[in-house]
Amino acid sequence: MSKFKLIHGDCLEKTNTLISANMWVDSVVTDPPYGLKFMGKDWDHGIPGKHFWEVIMQACKPGAHLLAFGGTRTFHRLTCAIEDAGWEIRDCIMWVRARVSKIA
């Protein structure tokens, strides 16, 4: 069985801790802000830019994978920031849901 560790907390703070400890990750799964100001919340004020994704890359082993969720209206900005930071965009997985259906 593989060994894994789930890290929860402020992303940049935790990433810098990993880098300082010379610990490298195989993959990153993240759901960053979509930049839609969801329900007027401060945490959804913008989309992480190039610098954010550069820091994430510094904590990754060569060949690591990144899975980042994004909103349909701002996904293009997220993807460009990731690519500008040096990540290779290989594939895009989309779940396009027009509306939530009621189950009887």
Regions found by a protein language model. Give the residues of each.
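Core catalytic lobe of class I
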Residues: S2-A104
